[in-house]
């Protein structure tokens, strides 16, 4: 079994639904495929810095200052983790209809020309083909269908970013309406855990 990269992005380190779900997913996968190597990156507790004038050249240029060199070293580290992973699990709560800025910053540091994608005469080409990603979302309302679906800037955004680097095997598991009260929250978690169990079964097949 190849490496599993686990990305938490919730700023809530307490009873975060997305953290509950990602812990469930990791436990289920390790049960199905005990030999899996897990690399954890908690972007909520230890966020990747935002791109600024001081560090931009470290990711999108030629680094020279200490800030730029530090940004390049972090970018290299994050990209190495991603390249080594056969599967990535992302816990992504919906913040203001999109993703936490900590997750956005992670993408800013790993989407690097020549490393995770390249430009050609035909346009950009992703260099990370063959990987699998499972995205676990938590949402206060219902955005997968109905009138609020037009306000879902989370799933389309993540699908596009992942597709840009060549990752098209992406599964989304949504825990929705968690803001509708305790019963709705519990039902959303239970439903998402059921979907996680089905996804985890595929890992035992791969491991075999």
Curated annotation (Swiss-Prot):
EC main group: oxidoreductase
InterPro entries: Flavodoxin_fold, Flavoprotein-like_sf, FMN-dep_NADH:Q_OxRdtase_AzoR1, NADH:quinone_OxRdtase_FMN_depd
Residues where FMN binds: 10, 16-18, 94-97, 138-141
Gene3D superfamilies, alphabetized: 3.40.50.360
EC number assigned by the record: 1.6.5.-, 1.7.1.17
PANTHER family named among the record's database cross-references: FMN-DEPENDENT NADH-AZOREDUCTASE 1, FMN-DEPENDENT NADH:QUINONE OXIDOREDUCTASE
Described function: Quinone reductase that provides resistance to thiol-specific stress caused by electrophilic quinones.
The family this protein is said to belong to: Belongs to the azoreductase type 1 family.
HAMAP family: Azoreductase_type1
UniProt protein name: FMN-dependent NADH:quinone oxidoreductase
Organism annotation: Hyphomonas neptunium (strain ATCC 15444)
